[in-house]
UniProtKB/Swiss-Prot annotation:
Keywords from the named record: Oxidoreductase, Pyruvate, Thiamine pyrophosphate
Necessary cofactors: thiamine diphosphate
Biological role stated in the UniProt entry: Component of the pyruvate dehydrogenase (PDH) complex, that catalyzes the overall conversion of pyruvate to acetyl-CoA and CO(2).
Pfam families with a match to the protein in the record: PDH_E1_M (PF17831), Transketolase_C_1 (PF22613), Transketolase_N (PF00456)
Organism of derivation: Buchnera aphidicola subsp. Schizaphis graminum (strain Sg)
A GO MF label: pyruvate dehydrogenase (acetyl-transferring) activity
Lineage top rank: taxon: Bacteria
Record's protein name: Pyruvate dehydrogenase E1 component
InterPro entries in UniProt: PDC_E1_N, PDH/Transketolase, PDH_E1, PDH_E1_M, THDP-binding, Transketo_C/PFOR_II, Transketolase-like_C_2, Transketolase_N
Catalytic reaction(s) noted: N(6)-[(R)-lipoyl]-L-lysyl-[protein] + pyruvate + H(+) = N(6)-[(R)-S(8)-acetyldihydrolipoyl]-L-lysyl-[protein] + CO2
Top-level EC class: oxidoreductase
Gene name for this UniProt entry: aceE
Subunit text: Homodimer. Part of the PDH complex, consisting of multiple copies of pyruvate dehydrogenase (E1), dihydrolipoamide acetyltransferase (E2) and lipoamide dehydrogenase (E3).
Length: 888
C-alpha cells in the first residue's frame, strides 16, 4: 500500500488497538510514560524523532474544516455575489480609466480579484468599526488591493465618482493614493502596508499593544481583533516571518493573519517547484500558531466524499504550485487530462462531469461559506494567534488576460474583448454600447444591494477603513518649570543620556500624563542608566513574573508584572520600533494618546530600521525616539559598527521627523517639554522627535536666560570670548560643543581673537526654516521678505561649525548663514576604537582643528598672515599630510 495514502486507513482495527493502548498508558501512567514508549519505538525502528514529528507540521492539502463541521452561512449569498461582482468591476474600471489618461499611473488589478471574496466576507460579517467602547477592529489591508477597497467605499457612498476617477492623481487634493497611506488620506487609511513585510510585523505588535492597554487597565480592548491581510509572495520578506514567535509568546488571540495564497508573486510562482501553503503551514504550526487551511471550495465537497481510495487527496498532495497555476491558466479539458488523468481512480471520479463543471471546481478563497467558517473558527481560538491560508487564483475572473498568468501582476490595460469577458463573467448590467466608456456600477439608494451593504455595516458599528485624525480628550502637558531641577547648574558631571533619564523620571511623576508614558527598550536599559525604572514602574509581561528574579534583593531588581509600564523588547530593534509605532499612533487607533520613548543605540535606528520610521511618518506617528550613545567619537570603545556619525543625515529625509542633537541637560529638558506641547497639546502636530544623547559625562551649566526659543528653533548664542575687534563665530552641537568652547578660549587667549560661541541644537530645523523662507520669497516677489532664523542670531564674521556627525549635517545651513566664509568639520569615515581625544584628532573635530579652521578663514580674508596658520598646525602637532579620515 502506498505510503502517500495519508488520509486513508487501510486497517481500522489495528489503528484502534494502537489508539486504545496509548490512551491506556496516558490514563494509567501519564504523558511522560507515553512519550517514553513512543521514543523507544522510534529508536528501535531507527526513525529520528525529528523526522517522525516533521509529518505533523504539514497536513493533507485539503481544508482544515471539513464540510461536516461547517455552519450555515449567515448572509444572503446571492445579494453578496452581486455586490462583490460590482466591486470587482469598479476596481477594474478605476484602474483602466486612470490608465486611459496615459499618465503612466499604473495600478494593480489581479491581487484584489484573487481576494475579493475574502474581503467581502469580512466586510459583511466580521470587521467591527470604531465605536463608543473601543477603536474597533484594526485592519492591515494588503497594499496592492487598494482599488478594491476604494470600489466598495464608492458603492457605500463614502467616496465620490470624482475621487475614484482621480485614482493615483493626488496633487490637486482630490485623488486616491496608490496604496494605503494615512499621510495622503488621513481620514481613511489607518495603516501603511507597503513596503511589503511591514504589515505583518506591525500587526503583531499592534495586537500586543492592545493587550498592553488592556492589562494595564488603561482601555478595554478585549473585543478588538487585529487582521493582517498578506500575500504569499510577501511572506518571503524577513519582516513577515521574523516576529511570529512573539505573537505566540504573548498569546495574541486577538490577531488573525489571512494569507492570500494565489501562488504567484510579481514575476511568477512563489514556490513553483513546491507548495507555499505547506511551507507556510509548517512554519506557523511549528511556531505555535493555529493554522486554518482553506484550500478547496464547496464544489469539491462531493468529489472528496466519493474518494474512497484516498487517491484524490494523494493527487492534491503531489501536485506542486507550478502545476496548479498552469491548470488554472488552461481549461476544463486540460484539467481533466493533466490533473485527474494522472490516476485511473481520480479520472473515474469525474467521468460524469462536463469540462465546464471541472473548470468551475473552485478554490477555497473564492468560496464565501468556506471563508466564513475559517474566520469564525479563528475568532474562537484562545491563547494563540491564528493564520488562515486561503488558496486562490491570481487574476480570478479575468480569463485569458490574466487569470493564473505570470504577467497577472503587471496588467494595467485590457482590450474591449477582455472587458466584455469580465462583464459577462460577473453578470454586470452594462450594454455593449456603454461598455466603451468604462462605466462604473452604481446601486440606487433603495436597491436591495445598497440597503444590504449598509445594513451589514450598521450591524458591525460603521464603516471601515476609517481614521481618527485627532484624539478627543485634551491632555495637561507639564510646563517647563516642572523640569526646573535640570535647568539649573548640576552638582556633578553627567551625560545627556542621564539627563534624558532624569527628564523621564520627572514626567513619570507628573500626575496628568504619567500613566501614558511608554518607555521602550531593546535590551539596553542598563547601558542607558535606566535600570532604576524596573522597580519603579515595572517591565510589562502579559503573564506577570512566575519566578524569583536573581537580583530580587537589589533596589533596581528585574521586576516583571502584568501592569508593567516598560516595553522590554529584547535584542530586537524591529520589534521595539513596531511597539513604538503602535504606541505613537494610539491617539488615532484608540482615541487614547500614549507617549512613547524608544531609546536605543543611535546607529541601530534609522540605519537598521529606516523603513519603519518612514512608515511612521506616513502613519502620522507622535512620540520620541532617543538615539543614545550617539556621536562618531563619543561612543569611543565600540568601534566601526556602533559609532554613529550619520543618523541625523538619515532622519532629515523624513519630513515630519524633528531632529535635535543637544549638548546640555537643560537643552534636553526644553526640547522634550516643547515636543510634548507640540504633539500632545492643543496643536496636536503630526510630527515625531528624534533626539540624540551621548554617554560622555561632563559639567552641565545652568540655562542662560531667554534661550528657550533658540533651543527649539535650533540655535542660540551660548557665550562670547572677548579679545580684539578681530572676530570669528564657532558653532557646534552635542559632544563637540565643548571642543568648540575650548577652541574659543584658545583663539581669545592665544590669538587675541573675539569668538562668539553658538549651541546648534538642530542644524536640520535651521535648514528647513531657511528653505521655507527662500521658497516663500521666491513665490511672493512683492511681499516683505522672510528672514531665516539663523540670520537673526548670527553675524557676518567668519564661521566654523564642528559636530560629531558627517560634514553634510552642518553643511545644510551654508546657504542661510549671514557669513560669506563658512567652514565645516565633521566625522566622515568609518568609526574605530580609541580614546575620545584620539578619535577627535583622527576625525579632525578636536579643539585644535577648530582653531586651525578659524585661523584659516581669517587668513583667506587677509585679516591675519598665513604664517599664523602654519605655526598653529606645528604648535598643535597636526600632521598636515595624514590620510583623509573619510578614506582611512
Amino acid at each position: 500500500m502506498s505510503e502517500k495514502l495519508y488520509n486513508y486507513d487501510v486497517d481500522p482495527v489495528e489503528t484502534n488497538d494502537w489508539v486504545q493502548s496509548i490512551e491506556s498508558v496516558i490514563r494509567e501512567e501519564g504523558l511522560e510514560r507515553a512519550k517514553f514508549l513512543i521514543e523507544k519505538i522510534l529508536k528501535k525502528s531507527k526513525i529520528t524523532r525529528a523526522n517522525f514529528f516533521k509529518c505533523f507540521f504539514t497536513s493533507d492539502y485539503i481544508n482544515t474544516i471539513s464540510s461536516e463541521e461547517e455552519v450555515e452561512y449567515p448572509g444572503d449569498l446571492i445579494l453578496e455575489k452581486r455586490i462583490r461582482s460590482a466591486i470587482r468591476w469598479n476596481a477594474i474600471m478605476m484602474v483602466l480609466r486612470a490608465s486611459k489618461k496615459d499618465l503612466e499611473l499604473g495600478g494593480h488589478l489581479s491581487s484584489f480579484q484573487s481576494s475579493a471574496t475574502i474581503y467581502e466576507v469580512c466586510f459583511n460579517h466580521f470587521f467591527r468599526s470604531k465605536n463608543d467602547e473601543d477603536g474597533g477592529d484594526l485592519v492591515y489591508f494588503q497594499g496592492h488591493i487598494a482599488p478594491g477597497i476604494y470600489a466598495r467605499s464608492f458603492l457605500e457612498g463614502r467616496l465620490s465618482k470624482k475621487q475614484i476617477d482621480n485614482f493615483r492623481q493626488e496633487v490637486d487634493g482630490k485623488g486616491l493614493s496608490s496604496y494605503p497611506h494615512p499621510k495622503l488620506m488621513p481620514n481613511f487609511w489607518q495603516f501603511p502596508t507597503v513596503s511589503m513585510g511591514l504589515g505583518p510585523l506591525c500587526a503583531i505588535y499592534q495586537a500586543k499593544f492592545l493587550k498592553y492597554l488592556q492589562n494595564r487597565e488603561l482601555k478595554n480592548t478585549s473585543k478588538q481583533t487585529v487582521y493582517a491581510f498578506l500575500g504569499d509572495g510577501e511572506m518571503d520578506e524577513p519582516e513577515s516571518k521574523g516576529a511570529i514567535s512573539i505573537a505566540v509568546r504573548e498569546k495574541l488571540d486577538n490577531l488573525i493573519f489571512v494569507i492570500n495564497c494565489n501562488l504567484q508573486r510579481l514575476d511568477g510562482p512563489v514556490v513553483g517547484n513546491g507548495k507555499i501553503v505547506n511551507e507556510l503551514e509548517s512554519f506557523f504550526y511549528g511556531a505555535g500558531w493555529k493554522v486554518i487551511k482553506v484550500i478547496w471550495g464547496g464544489k469539491w465537497d462531493s468529489l472528496l466524499k466519493k474518494d474512497k481510495t484516498g487517491k484524490l487527496i494523494q493527487l492534491m498532495n503531489e501536485t506542486i504550485d507550478g502545476e496548479y497555476q498552469t491548470l488554472k491558466s488552461k481549461d476544463g479539458a486540460y484539467v481533466r487530462k493533466y490533473f485527474f488523468g494522472k490516476y485511473q481512480e481520480t479520472l473515474e471520479l469525474v467521468k460524469n462531469m462536463t469540462d465546464e463543471e471541472i473548470w468551475n471546481l473552485n478554490r477555497g478563497g473564492h468560496d464565501p461559506k468556506k471563508m466564513f467558517n475559517a474566520l469564525k473558527k479563528a475568532k474562537e481560538i484562545k491563547d494563540k494567534p491564528t493564520v488562515i491560508l486561503a488558496h486562490t487564483v491570481k487574476g480570478y475572473g479575468m480569463g485569458v488576460i490574466a487569470e493564473g498568468k505570470n504577467i497577472a501582476h503587471q496588467i494595467k490595460k485590457i482590450n474591449i474583448n477582455g472587458i466584455i469577458y469580465i462583464r459577462d463573467r460577473f453578470n454586470i448590467p452594462i450594454s455593449n454600447e456603454d461598455i466603451k466608456e468604462l462605466p462604473y456600477v452604481v446601486f440606487e439608494k433603495n436597491s436591495k444591494e445598497y440597503c444590504y451593504m449598509h445594513q451589514q455595516r450598521k450591524k458591525l458599528g460603521g464603516y471601515i477603513p476609517f481614521r481618527l485624525s485627532k484624539f478627543t480628550n485634551a491632555l495637561n502637558i507639564p510646563d517647563l518649570i516642572d523640569f526646573k531641577s535640570l535647568l539649573k547648574e548640576q552638582n556633578k558631571k553627567m551625560s545627556t543620556t542621564i539627563a534624558f533619564v532624569r527628564v523621564l523620571n520627572l514626567i513619570l511623576k507628573n500626575h496628568s500624563i504619567k500613566n501614558l508614558i511608554v518607555p521602550i527598550i531593546a535590551d539596553e536599559a542598563r547601558t542607558f542608566g535606566m535600570e532604576g525604572l524596573f522597580r519603579m514602574i515595572g517591565i510589562y509581561s502579559s503573564i506577570g513574573q512566575k519566578y524569583v528574579p536573581q537580583d530580587r534583593e537589589q533596589l533596581a531588581y528585574y521586576k516583571e508584572e502584568k501592569k508593567g509600564q516598560i516595553l522590554q523588547e529584547g535584542i530586537n530593534e524591529l520589534g521595539a520600533a513596531s511597539s513604538w509605532l503602535a504606541a505613537a499612533t494610539s491617539y488615532s487607533t484608540n482615541d487614547f494618546p500614549m507617549i512613547p520613548f524608544y531609546i536605543y543605540y543611535s546607529i541601530f535606528g534609522f540605519q537598521r530600521i529606516g523603513d519603519l520610521f518612514w512608515a511612521a511618518g506616513d502613519q502620522q506617528a507622535r512620540g520620541f525616539l532617543i538615539g543614545g550613545t550617539s556621536g562618531r567619537t563619543t561612543l569611543n570603545g565600540e568601534g566601526l559598527q556602533h559609532e554613529d556619525g550619520h543618523s541625523h543625515i538619515q532622519s532629515l529625509t523624513i519630513p515630519n521627523c524633528v531632529s535635535y542633537d543637544p549638548a546640555f541637560a537643560y537643552e534636553v529638558a526644553v526640547i522634550i517639554q516643547d515636543g510634548l506641547r507640540r504633539m500632545y497639546g492643543p496643536l496636536q502636530e503630526n510630527i515625531y522627535y528624534y533626539i540624540t544623547t551621548i554617554n560622555e559625562n561632563y559639567y552641565m551649566p545652568a540655562m542662560p536666560q531667554g534661550v528657550e526659543k533658540g533651543i527649539c528653533k535650533g540655535i542660540y548664542k551660548l557665550k562670547t570670548f572677548y579679545a580684539t575687534e578681530l572676530k570669528v563665530q564657532l558653532m557646534g552641537s552635542g559632544a563637540i560643543l565643548r571642543c568648540i568652547c575650548k577652541a574659543g578660549e584658545i583663539l581669545s587667549n592665544d590669538y587675541c581673537i573675539t569668538t562668539d560661541i553658538y549651541s546648534v541644537t538642530s542644524f536640520t530645523e535651521l535648514a528647513r526654516n531657511g528653505e521655507d523662507c527662500e521658497r516663500w520669497n521666491m513665490l511672493h516677489p512683492y511681499e516683505k521678505k522672510r528672514i531665516a532664523y539663523i540670520k537673526t542670531v548670527m553675524n557676518s564674521s567668519p564661521a566654523v561649525a564642528a559636530t560629531d556627525y558627517m560634514k553634510l549635517f552642518a553643511e545644510q545651513i551654508r546657504h542661510y548663514i549671514p557669513s560669506n566664509e563658512y567652514h565645516v568639520l565633521g566625522t566622515d569615515g568609518f568609526g574605530r576604537s580609541d580614546s575620545r581625544d584620539k578619535l577627535r584628532d583622527h576625525f579632525e573635530v578636536s579643539a585644535y582643528y577648530i582653531v586651525v579652521a578659524a585661523l584659516n578663514l581669517l587668513a583667506k580674508l587677509n585679516n591675519i598672515n598665513k604664517k599664523v596658520v602654519e605655526e598653529a598646525i606645528i604648535k598643535f602637532n597636526i600632521n598636515a599630510d595624514k590620510i583623509n579620515p573619510r578614506l582611512a
